[in-house]
C-alpha cells in the first residue's frame, strides 16, 4: 500500500487522468456507434435471441486494450527510460523483424496467422491477423524508432548541424519511411517524418536547414502538380489529393462519375455528419445519425460531431491538445536531453495524428488512413499509445528538474 502511495505521489497524475478520460469517452462513443447501427448485439434471425456482442465488440476490445495498456504504462513508468534505450538492439530486431516480412509476403496464412494482411480496400498489406485480431507492427516500430532516434540525436547533439552528421540522421529517418511507403502505408510514413522533424527541431537543428527543407518540399510539390500530374499515377491516393483541391471535379481529374463519387463519398458524408450535430449533437444513444464509412475508425471525429456536436468535438480535441502540451512540457523539464528528445517524438506523433485526422474529417486534407489517438477503434493502436504514455511518465518520474527552475 505504501508503494502505491509513493507511486501516486511521484507520477504525473494529471497526465494519467487525461489518458483515462480519453479512453473512457472512446468506449462510450464506440458503444453509441454500435447501438446506432441497429444491430449492436448479434441476434439469431429465427429466434431473436442474442447470440453475441456483435458491433459492441469494438467497444469491448477498446476498453480491454485501454485497461491492459494502462497496466503496461504504469509498469513501464517505473523503469528508467535510459535503460530501455540501452537495449535498442533487442527492440529494433523484434519490431523491424515484424515489419519486414509483409514487404515480401502478402495474405499468406500459417495456421490462424495471416502475414501481409490487407485490413482495408487499399494497397496496404502491412498488417498481421491472428484469430480475428489485427495488428500493424509499424505502430510498435514507431516506438523503437523514437528511442533509437533520440539516442542518435543525444550522441551527436553538439554536431547536429554538421553536414556529415545531418546526413546520417536523415538516413536514419528516411530508411523506415521508405520501407513503410513501399508497404503502401503513406499515412504512417508521413507521421514518421513529422516525428523525426520534431525531434531534430528539439535537438537544435539550424533554421537554415528547416527553411531550406520547407522550401524544397514546397517546390517539389508544385513541380509535381505542374509538370508530372499526368505521370504520377491515377491510383486512389492521387485521386484523394485531387478531391481535396477540386471536390467538384471541374478539372476532370476523375476518369468517370462513378470514380469521382466513390472518392469523395467518405469525406462528404463525414462533413454532413459533423454539420448535422449542431452545437450539442443528436444524442449518444438516441436521435438520428448519418452513416459514414469507417465512422468507428479514421472518421470517428465525424461520429463524435454527429452525436455530441461542436461542444463534444471541442471537449475531445481539448483533452487531446492538453495531452500534447503535457508531453512537450515533460520533455522540457527533463534533466537530460535524451528524455527531452523522447518526449518530443511522442508529442510530435500525437500532434501529427490529431492534426491529420481532423484535417481528413473536415476535408482540408486527403484521406490517408491516420487514426484519432485513443478514440479510433483498434486494440493494438491503443496498446501502443499507452506504451508511449509509459515512456512519458518514465521521463517525468526519473527527472526532478522544475519546468521553470
Which sequence ranges carry the predicted segments?
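Hydrophobic alpha-helical segments of polytopic membrane proteins
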Residues: 67, 71, 89-96, 163-181, ...
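Loop-to-helix entry and N-terminal half of a specific, functionally important transmembrane alpha helix
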Residues: 330-369
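Membrane-helix boundary/helix-loop-helix interface segments in multi-pass membrane proteins
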Residues: 2-9, 13-15, 22, 28-30, ...
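Transmembrane alpha-helices of multi-pass, membrane-embedded glycan-processing enzymes
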Residues: 68, 92, 316-323
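Hydrophobic alpha-helical segments of membrane proteins
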Residues: 182, 186, 190, 281, ...
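Alpha-helical transmembrane segments of multi-pass membrane proteins, especially transporters
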Residues: 164-169, 213, 244, 290, ...
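Hydrophobic, glycine- and aromatic-enriched re-entrant/interface helices and adjoining loop segments
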Residues: 112, 118-127, 212-315, 337-339
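Interfacial segments of multi-pass membrane proteins
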Residues: 190, 195-209, 285-312, 370-385
Amino acid at each position: 500500500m505504501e508503494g502505491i502511495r509513493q507511486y501516486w505521489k511521484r507520477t504525473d497524475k494529471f497526465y494519467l487522468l487525461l489518458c483515462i478520460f480519453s479512453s473512457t469517452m472512446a468506449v462510450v462513443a464506440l458503444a453509441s456507434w454500435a447501438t446506432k447501427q441497429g444491430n449492436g448485439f448479434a441476434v439469431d434471425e429465427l429466434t431473436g435471441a442474442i447470440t453475441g456482442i456483435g458491433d459492441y465488440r469494438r467497444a469491448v476490445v477498446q476498453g480491454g486494450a485501454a485497461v491492459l495498456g494502462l497496466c503496461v504504462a504504469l509498469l513501464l513508468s517505473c523503469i528508467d527510460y535510459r535503460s530501455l534505450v540501452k537495449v535498442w538492439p533487442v527492440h529494433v530486431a523484434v519490431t523491424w523483424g515484424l515489419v519486414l516480412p509483409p514487404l515480401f509476403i502478402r495474405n499468406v496464412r500459417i495456421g490462424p496467422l495471416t502475414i501481409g494482411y490487407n485490413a482495408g480496400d487499399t494497397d496496404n498489406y502491412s498488417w498481421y491477423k491472428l484469430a480475428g485480431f489485427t495488428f500493424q507492427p509499424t505502430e510498435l516500430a514507431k516506438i523503437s524508432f523514437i528511442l533509437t532516434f533520440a539516442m542518435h540525436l543525444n550522441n551527436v547533439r553538439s554536431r547536429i548541424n554538421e553536414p556529415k552528421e545531418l546526413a546520417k540522421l536523415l538516413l536514419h529517418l528516411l530508411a523506415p519511411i521508405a520501407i513503410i511507403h513501399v508497404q503502401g502505408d503513406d499515412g504512417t510514413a508521413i507521421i514518421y517524418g513529422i516525428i523525426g522533424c520534431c525531434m531534430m527541431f528539439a535537438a537544435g537543428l539550424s533554421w537554415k536547414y528547416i527553411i531550406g527543407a520547407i522550401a524544397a518540399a514546397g517546390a517539389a510539390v508544385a513541380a509535381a502538380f505542374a509538370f508530372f500530374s499526368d505521370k504520377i499515377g491515377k491510383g486512389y491516393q492521387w485521386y484523394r489529393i485531387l478531391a481535396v483541391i477540386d471536390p467538384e471535379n471541374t478539372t476532370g481529374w476523375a476518369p468517370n462519375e462513378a470514380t469521382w463519387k466513390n472518392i469523395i463519398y467518405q469525406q462528404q458524408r463525414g462533413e454532413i455528419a459533423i454539420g448535422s450535430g449542431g452545437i450539442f449533437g443528436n444524442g449518444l444513444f438516441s436521435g438520428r445519425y448519418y452513416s459514414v464509412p469507417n465512422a468507428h475508425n479514421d472518421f470517428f471525429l465525424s461520429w463524435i460531431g454527429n452525436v455530441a456536436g461542436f461542444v463534444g468535438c471541442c471537449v475531445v480535441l481539448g483533452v487531446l491538445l492538453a495531452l500534447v502540451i503535457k508531453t512537450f512540457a515533460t520533455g522540457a523539464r527533463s534533466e537530460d536531453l535524451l528524455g527531452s528528445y523522447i518526449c518530443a517524438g511522442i508529442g510530435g506523433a500525437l500532434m501529427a495524428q490529431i492534426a491529420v485526422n481532423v484535417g481528413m474529417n473536415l476535408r482540408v486534407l486527403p484521406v490517408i488512413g491516420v487514426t484519432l489517438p485513443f478514440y479510433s477503434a483498434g486494440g493494438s493502436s491503443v496498446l501502443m499509445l499507452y506504451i508511449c504514455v509509459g515512456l512519458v511518465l518514465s521521463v517525468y518520474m526519473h527527472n526532478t528538474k522544475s519546468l521553470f527552475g
